[in-house]
Amino acid sequence: MEMWQADTFDPVTIDRELGWAEEIGMNCMRVYLHHLVWETDKEGFKKRINEYLTIADKHHISTIFVFLDDCWNPVYQAGKQPEPQPGVHNSGWARDPGDLYYKGDTAVILPVLESYVKDILITFKDDKRIVLWDLYNEPGGSGGYRYGERSLPLLQKIFTWGRTVNPSQPLSAGVWDMSLTNLNKFQLENSDVITYHTYEGVNSHQQLIDTLKQYGRPMICTEYMACLLYTSDAADERSSV
């Protein structure tokens, strides 16, 4: 949330880092939003999104925006964020909506989420600087706060909200865990562009590509490579030893 809140939005740093991205040839950036920033400062949030898009466009970088997310910290708050924990990966990353939905009052949070998603989509539905809307990152989650197939109803709802607005950009939600059968089925049947995550080696990655090709739609790998998992040619060699 620090990226988007008024007190910590930092266009100078964004400009510098997107400049580095441009220098190494990146032409698309995947960027996470959060409903709580919208809820506390709707118009300011949208102005900052537009400012980000202007900076990215200056560096010839298009944007994929992400709405919901089942990864990392399930509890969060607006305002000053916790300090990073040294040595802890993504220690400050906040889910959206997290426990506010999965352990809270869905009758309260659902209308907020619907208004948020529709407002952002309506505002930017014809913005050519946005190449795709990634509606839900890794639905089902992982680790000690895994929601599993319980994420399916919310996934279905956000696709319904997206189709109601019908933006000019494609809608998608990336598959990432083949054990989540019902989630995967819905994601693959309803995504305009097939997006996916893999942290496996080259051979396994190619097998996944071959499997997803059957849907006959464009494909984008929106997350890959992890040094600790040896995501290279050598990874497949290690796994066969």
Language-model segments: residues:
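Active-site mouth of glycoside hydrolases
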Residues: 1-193, 197-206, 214-217, 228
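The feature captures the conserved acid-bearing segment of alpha/beta-hydrolase catalytic domains
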Residues: 211
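Short acidic/histidine-rich active-site segments
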Residues: 221-226
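Conserved small/polar residues in nucleotide/adenosyl-binding loops
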Residues: 230-237
